[in-house]
């Protein structure tokens, strides 16, 4: 306490007690900061194949991945935002190749729909190694890397998955082999004498892999159960584009872009498989370049999207949340 004696009297100023301040802070923290454990779904399936959630280890493995998605907020929000732009590209390719729609969630487990590079050298949304990409028809060299071409890489992934399904006779094992490698998973199945993914003892990454896919699917389909209240307007919209067929060498890609009212940066953003300033093409291959339509890069182009009345994948109205 500080006491000041003046002519008019005595003035007393009370210095705040630090313990009181800390106590108030802790009280506010306890009142407002709460973490709830999300409930697991009663049933789950992948590509129409049932997940044995009655098995304790299976249930706890799914719980681990759902917790990861639930509390890695920025990563999961990115999943929702990117998926609204890229699922419309991926889904029809899966359908055309008779691959179950659930495999779009495999791309989330691989890269969260971003052009990632793994420590092992796998690249692109579908995370192909150089050798595997070439095996499934992708051009990979210093100037062109079609692992970054979402359409072609999705087609290549479909070819692999169909071959794996033909061999294993099971979509879940086919998905697991995408992570472990065909030979590695086949060896595990043969040595352990089981034909069910959920009965296999696997390396940690592959042991978690299917559960990560399942968790992505569950949270995508029931986001508000896990605390994600998102409006359609929160998502990245599909960008309006057109294509140009190129079957000759393009010596100067920055100039090619400029002639079309674009920058080299925009050309690369929409064609990340191009890795140089030129597009050599002595063999006269056909390349398809994707370019944005006029004004497609302006935020105002998408401002007329109809406002959401309810949250994504939920009947709860936005004005009813409390």
Explain the meaning of each model-derived region:
Residues 1-98:
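An acidic, Gly/Ser/Thr/Pro-rich helix-cap/linker signature
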Residues 99-114, 174-180, 267-270:
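Short, functionally critical alpha-helical segments immediately adjacent to catalytic or ligand/cofactor-binding
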Residues 253-281:
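LysM (lysin motif) carbohydrate-binding repeats in extracellular/periplasmic proteins that recognize
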Residues 69, 73-80, 90-93, 113-123, ...:
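Second-shell loop/turn segments in exported
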Residues 231-261, 316-322:
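Primarily a LysM-type cell-wall glycan-binding module
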Residues 161-188:
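Catalytic and binding regions of secreted/periplasmic enzymes and modules that target cell-wall glycans
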Residues 270-308:
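Extracellular LysM carbohydrate-binding repeats and other cell-envelope/extracellular binding modules
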Residues 121-142, 154-156, 161, 185-188:
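Substrate-binding/active-site groove segments that recognize
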């Amino acid at each position: 306490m500080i006491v000041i004696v003046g002519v008019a009297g005595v003035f007393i100023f009370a210095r705040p007690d630090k313990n009181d301040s800390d106590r108030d802070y802790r009280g506010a923290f306890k009142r407002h900061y709460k973490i709830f454990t999300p409930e697991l779904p009663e049933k789950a399936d992948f590509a129409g194949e049932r997940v044995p959630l009655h098995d304790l280890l299976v249930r706890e493995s799914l719980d681990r991945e759902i917790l990861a998605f639930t509390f890695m907020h920025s990563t999961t929000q990115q999943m929702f935002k990117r998926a609204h732009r890229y699922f419309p590209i991926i889904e029809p390719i899966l359908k055309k190749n008779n691959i179950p729609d659930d495999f779009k969630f495999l791309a989330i487990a691989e890269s969260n729909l971003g052009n990632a590079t793994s420590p092992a050298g796998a690249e692109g949304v579908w995370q192909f190694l150089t050798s595997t990409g070439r095996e499934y028809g992708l051009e990979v060299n210093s100037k062109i890397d079609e692992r970054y071409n979402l359409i072609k890489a999705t087609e290549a992934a479909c070819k692999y998955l169909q071959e794996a399904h033909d061999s294993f006779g099971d979509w879940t094992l086919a998905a697991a082999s995408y992570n472990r490698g065909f030979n590695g998973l086949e060896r595990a199945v043969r040595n352990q004498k089981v034909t069910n993914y959920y009965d296999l003892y696997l390396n940690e990454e592959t042991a978690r892999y299917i559960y990560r896919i399942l968790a992505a699917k569950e949270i995508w389909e029931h986001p508000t159960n896990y605390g994600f209240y998102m409006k359609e307007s929160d998502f990245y919209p599909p960008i309006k584009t057109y294509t140009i067929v190129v079957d000759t060498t393009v010596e100067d890609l920055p100039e090619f872009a400029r002639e079309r009212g674009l920058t080299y940066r925009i050309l690369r953003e929409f064609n990340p498989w191009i890795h140089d300033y030129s597009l050599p093409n002595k063999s006269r291959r056909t390349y398809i370049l994707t370019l944005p339509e006029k004004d497609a890069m302006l935020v105002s182009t998408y401002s007329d999207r109809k406002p959401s009345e309810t949250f994504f994948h939920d009947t709860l109205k936005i004005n009813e949340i409390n």
